[in-house]
C-alpha cells in the first residue's frame, strides 16, 4: 500500500487534501484512483489508513479511516554528526541513515570540508535534506521523521556534546585502533556518531573530540568513504544494541 507524508495533524473521519509534493507523486507517479487505499503519516508515530475520496486536476482528497500506532522505531537513539559532503553523497547518507533508524542528523562544517554554503544555499539544502528524509520514511515504513538540524561549524560541537554528555560518543577515524568489538556489551542510552569529511577530521578536531570523552574508533582494516562509514557503524550499532539482532 502506498505511503505518503502529510505535514499537518490528522484525525479520524477527516477529509484532507494531500500536500502538493505527495499529491503530485500520487497522481503522476503512483497513478492513484478514487477509492484506492493509502497510508498517511505526519511524524507523530502513528499510521493513518485512508482512502482516496476524490481527484481533481491537481489535488487529491483523502478520507482518514483508522489510526494505528507504528512500533517499528529503533529502541536506541542514534545521533549522527555528519561532515557535509557533495550533494549526492550527503543525500545518500541522509536517505540510508533514515532507513537504518537514526533519530537526529547534525550536519557539520569541519576544517577539511570542501563544501561551502552561503546562508541562502544552506536554507535550501536543509529543506532538501528534510525532504530526502521524508521520502526515506515513506519507503522504509517509519512514521517518525529524524530531526535534521541546521548545519553548524565544528567549533560549535562542544556545546552539542555538553548537552549529550551522558551518551556514548564515537569518532570514526582510520588511524585509531579501537575496534567495534570493544564497545560496551550492554548499553541502552543515546549514541552519538562523528563522521569526518573526505580526508578525515584534522588532528586538532580529533583532539577536541577526545577531550570531550569521545571514543576514537576504526571499522576494520580498510578506509571507508565519508558516505560509507556512517552506514556501516549504524548497522553495527543496530545489531549490537538495537533491532537488527
Descriptions of predicted regions:
Residues 9, 67, 110-112, 221:
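Short, ordered loop/turn segments at secondary-structure junctions
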Residues 203-245:
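Structured adenosyl-cofactor binding patch, chiefly the S-adenosyl-L-methionine
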Residues 38, 63, 69-81, 185, ...:
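Mobile, glycine- and charge-enriched loop segments
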Residues 167-205, 215-217:
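Active-site/ligand-binding-proximal alpha/beta "capping" segment
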Residues 38, 62, 145-149, 216:
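Generic structural signal for residues in well-ordered beta-strands
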Residues 1-69:
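N-terminal positively charged helical leader segments and presequences
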Residues 71-168:
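RNA substrate-binding interface of SAM-dependent RNA methyltransferases
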Amino acid at each position: 500500500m502506498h505511503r505518503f507524508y502529510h505535514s499537518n495533524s490528522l484525525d479520524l473521519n477527516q477529509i484532507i487534501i494531500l500536500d502538493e509534493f505527495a499529491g503530485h507523486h500520487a497522481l503522476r507517479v503512483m497513478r492513484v484512483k478514487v477509492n484506492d487505499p493509502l497510508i498517511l503519516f505526519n511524524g507523530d508515530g502513528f499510521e493513518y489508513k485512508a482512502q482516496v475520496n476524490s481527484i481533481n486536476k491537481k489535488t487529491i482528497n483523502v478520507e482518514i479511516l483508522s489510526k494505528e500506532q507504528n512500533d517499528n522505531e529503533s529502541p536506541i537513539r542514534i545521533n549522527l554528526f555528519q561532515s557535509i559532503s557533495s550533494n549526492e553523497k550527503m543525500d545518500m547518507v541522509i536517505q540510508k541513515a533514515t532507513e537504518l533508524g537514526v533519530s537526529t542528523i547534525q550536519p557539520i562544517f569541519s576544517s577539511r570540508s570542501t563544501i561551502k554554503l552561503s546562508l541562502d544555499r544552506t536554507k535550501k539544502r536543509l529543506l532538501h535534506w528534510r525532504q530526502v528524509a521524508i521520502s526515506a520514511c515513506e519507503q522504509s515504513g517509519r512514521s517518525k521523521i529524524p530531526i535534521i538540524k541546521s548545519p553548524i561549524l565544528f567549533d560549535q560541537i562542544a556545546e552539542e556534546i555538553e548537552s549529550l554528555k551522558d551518551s556514548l560518543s564515537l569518532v570514526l577515524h582510520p588511524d585509531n585502533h579501537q575496534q567495534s568489538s570493544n564497545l560496551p556489551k550492554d548499553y541502552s542510552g543515546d549514541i552519538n556518531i562523528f563522521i569526518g569529511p573526505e580526508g578525515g577530521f584534522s588532528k586538532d578536531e580529533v583532539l577536541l573530540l577526545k577531550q570531550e570523552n569521545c571514543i576514537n574508533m576504526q571499522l576494520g582494516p580498510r578506509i571507508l568513504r565519508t558516505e560509507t562509514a556512517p552506514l556501516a557503524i549504524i548497522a553495527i550499532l543496530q545489531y549490537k544494541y538495537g533491532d537488527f539482532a
